[in-house]
């Protein structure tokens, strides 16, 4: 940077000069002062026009009349006015005569004192006045002074002493490379601002010696600087009186004038007021200097009059006339910074790089400010010379910045710095849960930014994403995003470099040097969207912002024909995009590598992947800079931290990034710390590793490096004082990251983090979570490194570093424009202009209307966006590209909102406003009041780039029962609509997504709040997003491909650990929730793999407490605390497997959707008393997992819940997790939560399931009586139940059925109770769900909901299928778990797993229990309830079947669900109605049974029912089978001999091993001690989808057959649904069936359960089912039961054999499972779609396709076997031939021997 510092030869002269005015007041003129001459000439005689009554329009004097009367340009103004010095100015100043010099000096003096000085010690005589006037007239038209000067330096009070001394002082202070200590005290006193007290010790001890010049105070934006230019007219014609006022206020002691600011007659306050009044006008003039005319011309042109006119015009304009430049709408921007490009700003700021003041920046600003006691009493001791301290003051006021008042034990609040101590988060203007007050902003922001795949606002750069990259970006799902990086800088390298293009350089009179790159391309994607040609353009000016983007050829008006090989004239293209550019100045650049390389260097100037970071060591009790620098060596805590942070490297010979360290002679130390993160190299300047100088307190060798680092880490030991930047003196250190260690050098070591940054450094991520300490781990290291990298990137956006970069950029452009161009203009067609003279000028063709809407880049509109956080409107630029929607605030020039176009689900538009809904219903509102057509354009653009649609507003009416007639799940998706009800008539359809209810955004509501609003609002007005054509709900990409990090009840206090990976020591707490909004207990979050492993642990053991904790506890829908609902002392013993987590809980809960308490500890059995309402909620007891396992092992009595049941739950969870697979652990955790919640919350379950429910939800919903399913046998009126369920909209009463009776008989197993409770506890989301909570709805709902919920699956559709599969998976998982847990329970429960028969019974019967009234619909409802119960665990298979047939099918995947359902139905024989889990599975899959019920085939269910039998056999299966038998008679025709037989089989299944094969069945059966009805549900689980399909070839074959059977029956719907889910869960289910199968393990581990589960299943061999056991004579045999049992047994054997096969072929099985998993995923989308709609042909086709795939796999195996057999046959044939030959040979030999014998005998 060129220095204004005087040369050494001139300095003595200046120093020796006396002041212009002596002490006596007489002027003393020195004519040999070159600088004085120069400044006078520039200023036109320092006060020439002071006395003029009316100044000339733009004369020198008039410029200074009021703001700086008679005062010479001084200080930075004098230095910057024309910087660098221009030759013309120098010459002119040289030519000025001594007389002019003298007179100007006198003029200056007289102007200060000429008015009758009131209080001044000197007055001018008439001669002096005449001289002043003469000088004014003489120099009136001289070169005008630079108008871009700070008023502070033109005010008399700014110069208490001689102007000459002040000028000399200014000259000394160039780039700040001269230290203050070089000045004598007098000089400083003279030049120091009047607002500061002078001090004797002016010097700078610390800090960088190169503070950067800059315009305006730190942190000011350009438009802020313009605000002072408004009132220029008022300052145009000052009178002598006014001037005298100014002179009086500013007397200077040091000179001969009595104008001392402090001691003058006018108070300091008045001085301050006057000072403020003068600052703004001057700044306005400075702006006018950079008007429309070229600055180069202004500086070099002698035509002052012409310049004066242009300046006058600009001065007369108001600030409002200067508006940001708007790019033509046809231009599609490539990145965010291109949208921010402002041509008007470039014009006005073009020369700001030259007119910069030195400022005190970084930590030095705080250091100086800390020494100031008040705005008028700054101490000069530590201030920078001439203006640095002034710059610290805000523009409009001298008041000092006070900081942000944020402090903690790590950092103190400090002036000019902003602190981040945790919880700040990212600014959000959209309406979402995170900013709706549901939970603290810090937590939401923290987990959003750290764990979600959302790109932070500061991380958005490139907006145009190529089609091939439209897949989910890996970078977006990384934990920490690098921010503030101009990735668009690669635009030239990517699209121009080494491709055919044109470069044009030139010097525009307004813009200065410019460089333009243009390329015409024909991208393939353009062929589909209209214009085949596209122009890519880069327009560069001296400003850092660059215009990058493209424009379609069809959008450009041109005289040439479009879409030709020749293309359009480039001149017309540029004139259309940048009309302000004078294209005639452009010349074609050389086509050489040097030019292209320099262009790339210019564009990528701001990209730096090598960073240096300082590390300061602060011991206990220390806080100052000297103390930290003087720590000679590092302590153990510091060493431990350094070891975590990076690698200790030897500097000598180090070849990587060295960060100015000496790698040859060790002068900067022998070692340093180096590391890499992502693409960045980081070299740390560690204070203790840099050389230590014992005799130097300042440790300059250390400060030399660390003091010049932009980012510094301050490591604090315990006991260190809070850090404050005011203790540091450096102009470069802008950001400090404070890290404090806790429990150093121990296993529990952890770190706290805080950040303090200079106020003009924008905020940066990742955000610091509030109150969180980071354990020592790679996660913390990544967090810290990302924070440091982002800090430096953000600091480069501060004024100081932008000024440096702008200067560099300008030099690059100058070099290109002057040295690398040809003489070829951009339009070289004018060789013979006379030819075209006679012809008429060609008219330009009109552009194709709306052509730009198909552009790939971002189309921009100026809008007003609503900030929901601050309840205000913002002037923003809305940019919509093919991948992003961004809102950029114009004032701060920062992105305030961004989302992916693939996340947009819909919008609501009016003539002047637009509300865009994205992701889960969050919304952002924009409006346009200028052009109503803009809203239409934005809507068209949204239609082009997104899959959303226009929303629909409707008013819903209630029926006679006050019901709205539809069910809505927790996501706001309509799960079921009552056919031909009011809602249906209004146009509401299944799959519709509610985004607003009564003007309240659904995204801000919890599910309970949503339901409450629907139930209580008098007039229900909703805004919905219509579903897709196939009735699937519109889902965002985020929902589809990544699971939400939180449960659906986000407003319930989920522990931060769940959302943040650093703290994992907190366990879930059981909190009684007093209402629907009661917080769920958060669970500790484990890594996804850990969670899966835990979940999958076999041996019936519950997962570790951490995993259990992961599942939050929900509160009952009726708002009662879960604890009250489930008391450990209840009569019913409930053993919950860790896997079951929430499922078992849900089962026990009667009407509360979220009745189960958090499953934090899955271990332990509870003895629960039936609630008066007749339902007990089984909760996970705090008991240890081991305990639970043991209890389940007991299994002898119905009381103990078989381990299989627990396994089932956990397996389902695991399966869901495994399906998520690639999704991040957050998703995984989320899914767990969902499972749990649904479990606890039947409504939640139904919430999840309804979306996926395929069965006629309307019917199921209507079946309020079905809801009665409540375990209470007593039939309570639907209304009664509805009263309990707050979530039911369709039928509120159906949601919860209460009975005064006990749910279970004493002999009923816990599992039974649980399943039944589950049914009871189910509550519909909006009422319909409640009804569906009945067997069919609940189970289906839970699974379906899970599927529909974003958490349920990686993709929207996939998610839904995932849940389906999860139901299947659950069944499988349950089985697997069962197998694992079976270790103990399996033996007893294996028979239970055969509850298929009972399942069929329950299904067949309307499932009317003795005391409860159930219709088939009820049964369906009951099943749904069960499933709802299940839904708590994502895999709820219970569902109600309308027809007994459905229930009969044992193969249905809902068998797992049946385990639950069976438990409920088996609780009492008379209570024949139990929700069918099979039905649930169906619903999960998305199939709905016309009957409204779901097939449930669960051997386990049947067994469980049998267990409730009076004959409780030691084995649970026996008991279950008995129960089933008893129930079967009661059940409707559905309960048939088949079911009874199945029950018997289950009861008598020979060994626990055989049970293993039916593990999933067993799981369900133990739960249901009730009769056959629950069994039916289980049977559903057991259906083909569960066992057969997943078992080996035969098993698959059987399964498929079973599935077909189920489909044929009313249950087939269930089965179908199960089957669809099957594809996802298939691998899982197969493992469950073949717990012992290795292949099963592979599949199961992949999707269903954790690796441990798989291992467990492998360990446990699949026992041969053996002969079909005969029923006990005392077991009320029934032929139908026998038939059912026989069928079930057949399937069981098939499964067993299949499992055996798979055991022999573990690899192939595993691969098969993977294939199945893939298949499931592939089918997920279609399934989910079908879920939301009634069963359709498409959904069945999908199901059949899945079956076909499995059959193909079986066929493949059969072919392999056939080939093997053929080979064997060939061997046999060969052996046969060989044997024949041998036989022939033997015969021949024998013949010969015989002949020989006979011959011998004859001879003898």
Swiss-Prot record:
GO terms for biological process: actin cytoskeleton organization; activation of GTPase activity; ephrin receptor signaling pathway; regulation of axonogenesis; regulation of dendritic spine morphogenesis; regulation of GTPase activity; regulation of small GTPase mediated signal transduction; regulation of synaptic plasticity. CDD domains: PDZ_SIPA1-like (cd06745). Residues 1735-1795 form a coiled coil. Residues 613-830 form the Rap-GAP domain. Residues 380-400, 1080-1093, 1186-1205, 1399-1431 have a biased composition (Polar residues). It comes from the Eukaryota. Keywords: Coiled coil, Cytoplasm, Cytoskeleton, GTPase activation, Methylation, Phosphoprotein, Synapse, Synaptosome, Ubl conjugation. Residues 967-1045 form the PDZ domain. Its main location: cytoplasm. One of its GO terms (molecular function) is ephrin receptor binding. It holds the Pfam family SPAR_C. Residues 1-157, 277-297, 380-401, 1067-1128, 1144-1207, 1268-1306, 1327-1366, 1379-1475, 1505-1536 are annotated as: Disordered. Widely expressed. Residues 27-36, 84-94, 1379-1389, 1507-1527 have a biased composition (Basic and acidic residues). The modification Phosphoserine is found at residues 162, 187, 193, 208, 255, 288, 1078, 1087, 1116, 1127, 1149, 1170, 1181, 1255, 1270, 1326, 1349, 1366, 1390-1391, 1412, 1431, 1433, 1528, 1549, 1554, 1565, 1568, 1585, 1588, 1603, 1645, 1647, 1650, 1708, 1711, 1728-1729, 1734. Transmembrane segments: none annotated. InterPro entries: PDZ, PDZ_sf, Rap/Ran-GAP_sf, Rap/Ran_GAP_dom, Rap1_Ran_GAP, SIPA1L_C. The modification Phosphothreonine is found at residues 1330, 1551. Ubiquitinated and degraded by the SCF(BTRC) following phosphorylation by PLK2. Residues 95-129, 1144-1160, 1282-1297, 1336-1349, 1450-1472 have a biased composition (Low complexity). GO terms for cellular component: actin cytoskeleton; cytoplasm; dendritic spine; plasma membrane; postsynaptic density. The modification Asymmetric dimethylarginine is found at residue 1601. Stimulates the GTPase activity of RAP2A. Promotes reorganization of the actin cytoskeleton and recruits DLG4 to F-actin. Contributes to the regulation of dendritic spine morphogenesis. Interacts with DLG4, PDLIM5, PDLIM7 and LZTS3. Interacts with the actin cytoskeleton. Interacts (via PDZ domain) with EPHA4 (via PDZ motif); controls neuronal morphology through regulation of the RAP1 (RAP1A or RAP1B) and RAP2 (RAP2A, RAP2B or RAP2C) GTPases. Interacts with HPV E6. This is Signal-induced proliferation-associated 1-like protein 1. The lineage of its organism: Eukaryota, Metazoa, Chordata, Craniata, Vertebrata. The gene is SIPA1L1.
